[in-house]
C-alpha cells in the first residue's frame, strides 16, 4: 500500500509508504489528491498530518515509470498539480512532518502545507535539473528566500533542515521521527480544538492575502517542464540516472 489514512479525534493522518524512497507514480499522485480532497470535505476532520515511513519523506515522482513510458509525463504533472492544490485549498490546516529526504514532489507536499516540521537530519531539494525535468519552484518559493531557491534550482543541491530552520522555513526541528510525530500530533490536537468554521475561514483568508497564486504559478511552471521533457538532453538525463552514469549533454538550437 502506497498511502495509509486514518482518522482519530479530528486528526486525519496520511502516511506515505511506498518503498524504497516514497517516489509516487502517476496513479498514486492522483489517488493522493483525491484522498486529500475527500478529507477536506469530511466533517470529522479538523486537521490533516502528512508523514511517511521508511528512509525519507518523499523523493517525488517515479522516474522509472517515465523511463518506461514517456507519455506518462502528462499524468504525472496532472497528479502533482492536483495534489499540491488539494493541500493548499484543503478546508482544514495541513501539517507536513518531514524526515530524511524531502525531494522533488516532496517539496510540493511540504511547500503546499500550512506548517512544516522536520527531523534534524532531514534535507530539502529539487534535483530535477539533473533528472531532465523542472517544477516545484513555486512551492520551493513558499519555503525559502529567493537566492536560496535559485541556487537550489540551478544546482540541484539540497538545503539542510537546520539551514531551513534558520530561514524560518520550518516550524521546529526534532531529534528523531518519533519526537517529530508526537510534536505534529500535539500541534494538530491544539488546532483540532478550535472552531471549525473559524479555522476554515482563517485558512481561506491566509491563502487570499498571500502574495501571488501558487496553484497558477505551478501550472505555468509545468509548461516549461513539458518543453524541457521534449528535448534530447532531458531523455539523456533520465537515461543517465537510471543507468547510474554521468550524463552527456549537448547544446540544442
Predicted regions and their residues:
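Conserved CoA-thioester-binding segment of acyl-CoA-metabolizing enzymes
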Residues: 1-53, 89
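C-terminal alpha-helix plus adjacent terminal tail
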Residues: 1-9, 43, 156-162, 181-182, ...
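Glycine- (often His-adjacent) and acidic-residue-rich active-site loop
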Residues: 4-6, 38, 44, 51-86, ...
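Terminal peptide-recognition signature
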Residues: 14, 32, 50, 62, ...
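Hydrophobic alpha-helical membrane-association signature
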Residues: 28-32, 76-79, 221
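Crotonase-fold acyl-CoA enzyme core
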Residues: 88-196, 231, 236, 245
Amino acid at each position: 500500500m502506497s498511502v495509509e489514512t486514518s482518522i482519530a479525534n479530528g486528526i486525519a493522518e496520511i502516511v506515505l509508504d511506498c518503498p524504497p524512497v516514497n517516489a509516487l507514480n502517476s496513479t498514486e499522485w492522483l489517488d493522493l489528491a483525491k484522498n486529500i480532497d475527500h478529507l477536506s470535505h469530511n466533517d470529522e476532520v479538523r486537521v490533516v498530518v502528512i508523514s511517511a515511513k521508511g528512509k525519507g519523506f518523499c523523493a517525488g515522482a517515479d522516474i522509472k515509470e517515465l523511463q518506461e513510458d514517456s507519455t506518462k509525463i502528462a499524468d504525472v504533472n496532472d497528479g502533482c498539480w492536483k495534489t499540491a492544490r488539494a493541500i493548499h485549498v484543503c478546508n482544514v490546516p495541513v501539517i507536513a512532518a518531514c524526515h530524511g529526504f524531502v525531494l522533488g514532489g516532496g517539496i510540493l507536499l511540504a511547500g503546499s502545507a500550512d506548517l512544516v516540521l522536520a527531523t534534524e537530519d532531514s534535507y530539502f531539494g529539487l534535483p530535477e535539473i539533473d533528472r531532465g525535468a523542472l517544477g516545484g519552484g513555486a512551492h520551493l518559493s513558499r519555503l525559502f528566500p529567493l537566492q536560496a531557491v535559485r541556487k537550489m534550482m540551478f544546482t540541484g543541491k539540497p538545503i539542510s533542515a537546520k539551514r531551513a530552520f534558520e530561514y524560518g522555513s520550518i516550524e521546529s526541528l526534532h531529534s528523531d521521527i518519533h519526537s517529530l510525530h508526537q510534536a505534529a500530533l500535539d500541534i494538530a490536537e491544539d488546532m483540532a480544538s478550535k472552531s471549525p468554521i473559524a479555522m476554515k475561514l482563517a485558512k481561506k483568508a491566509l491563502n487570499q492575502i498571500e502574495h501571488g497564486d501558487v496553484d497558477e504559478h505551478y501550472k505555468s511552471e509545468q509548461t516549461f517542464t513539458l518543453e524541457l521533457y521534449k528535448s534530447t538532453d532531458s531523455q539523456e538525463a533520465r537515461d543517465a540516472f537510471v543507468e547510474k552514469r554521468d550524463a552527456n549533454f549537448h547544446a540544442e538550437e
